[in-house]
């Protein structure tokens, strides 16, 4: 079971990233390989995001756990792809991307109103990658989070060069936390404000 959380409707765009990171002493405000205000920011490592003066520190936001990410992606669906189940309608992948990222929100939203959960760019998650995490009891407790294992971190969603198999709701990948690559961006979460 998951506690309530809020997740961004879109992957963080280059314009949003630049607005938050302006004036940073060492990190680039425009790190992306593909340039465009409404394109997802990429080439931002997990280490960059988590440094004290990084995007997450400056905004007070967090990365989703893998469980939060998959719950948000599926939006109640049980098939391989959310929404109407047709990948071409839901995301950018190898067969329709023209070998590049695309402006966020140009494909259909899933039933939670979230865009680009399939393809465009992979998205960092909070979890340490463990190949057999879902075979453990921890995966089925409240607010599951993998903290044990190798140094690699979970990335989800697939990206614009991935095949259909690799952008499924359930597909899991990993990356070293210092990776800066045009295939990886992020979508933050936060806890809802307490009721008065």
Walk through the language-model features, giving the residues of each.
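Proline-centered structural pivot motif
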Residues: 25, 31, 90, 139-144
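Surface-exposed recognition segments
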Residues: 77, 97-100, 117-196
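Short, well-structured beta-strand-loop connectors
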Residues: 19, 115-117
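Residue-level detector of short, conserved catalytic/binding motifs and their immediate flanks
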Residues: 3-5, 112, 153, 186
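A short, contiguous structural element within a folded domain that forms the immediate neighborhood
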Residues: 89-114
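Active-site microenvironments of metalloenzymes and redox enzymes
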Residues: 1-87, 126-134, 190-196
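Active-site rim elements
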Residues: 37-40, 104, 109, 172-178
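Short coil/loop residues immediately preceding or within conserved phosphate-binding loops
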Residues: 2, 36, 99-101, 109, ...
